[in-house]
Amino acid sequence: MHILVVNDDGPPNERVSPYVRPLVDELQSAGHLISVAIPAASRSWIGKAHLIEAELTAHLVHPDSFRPDGSWDSTYKPDPTTEDGAAGPQSDWVVIQNGTPASCTQLGLHNLFTDLPPIDLVISGPNHGRNASTIYNLSSGTVGGALEAVFCGKRGIAISFGSKDPQTDSVIAAAARLAVKLVGHLWRNWDERVELYNINIPMREDVEGQPVLYTRTLPYYWSRGCLYAETDRRKEEARRVLNGATNGVNGVHKETNGVNGVNGVNGVNGVNGVNGAHHGEPEAEAEAGTVSKQRHFKWSADLSDMKKRLQESEEGTDAHTVLNGSTSVTALRANFWHVPGLEGPIDLEL
């Protein structure tokens, strides 16, 4: 089977993307033809988004050239006397600058591997942590990559390894073996009502001996406050003014933001790394001491209530299953379906 692997955690990285290489290796060991297209930077919580104003750049990267921090050695050359080295470019992964999980799926299906047999299945993941409950599933870039596959006429499977804590190699290997076995089972026994599966695998040494259960998605809504916290940038802005406001030339603020110039967009900071130059902010161009007309916020989600709700979740849900040591498989369809019965004319006078 030809499988496209995408993810939302980016290149192999000991801290934020430790699971993708072990899964790819295990899939290849099972005899599958594997093509890999992944974003150049973490794109968690991005759902099925595309950065439509960004130009995407595909970098061919040999998997053995990745460093522990997710960067890679662009001068790396595999040993041609080995089986992997002799495979040439076919063994390369594709790392996509400005990529998202959904755009990696698009390019992987339609542009990057046209010299290979048609892709049968898209696997998105493994995510670094659980994707259980409606909030996680609708926000997840991992699930988003599998959703995009469905809209391209392919089957999709989202896989999440259920812990962000450091894991031993043996625990990761066990999760990867189970994932590959489960993928094979689902492929052979695919229910035609299903468009994608969402899998959550707990990280434990004996995971292969634990139950694997079909589950339903836990409904959940934010129970408190905003996901962002306001920051006080006044001192920082005053300091920037005194130091000449911007780091670039003529008010252009350049920011490579990563290794090999691939984490930002074209190495120049536009809107959160999307194309173009980031000109000096009005605040920075004003004189120190003026009243700011800007407010600044950073991601600061309080997940304590959510974690408590997940711990108390009902038996049979994805969250309850994975938190109690079993593997969760949730069968999904790729839609926001309408509420039945609300049809026909609307009387605005009521």
Task: State each model region's role.
Residues N131-S140:
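Glycine/threonine-rich flexible loop motifs
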Residues L178-L182:
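Glycine- and Gly-Pro-enriched alpha-helical subdomains that act as flexible
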Residues D8-D9:
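Active-site metal-binding loops of divalent metal-dependent hydrolases
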Residues S124-R130:
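Short acidic, glycine-rich surface-loop motifs adjacent to enzyme active sites
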Residues S35-A37, V95, I123, R155-I159, ...:
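Hydrophobic/aromatic beta-strand patches that form the interior of the parallel beta-sheet core
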Residues H2-I3, P12-N13, S17-P118:
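A cross-family phosphate/adenosyl-ligand binding-site feature
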Residues I135, A146, V150-A174:
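Glycine-rich phosphate/pyrophosphate-binding loops
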Residues L186-L350:
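C-terminal accessory domains and tails appended to enzymatic cores
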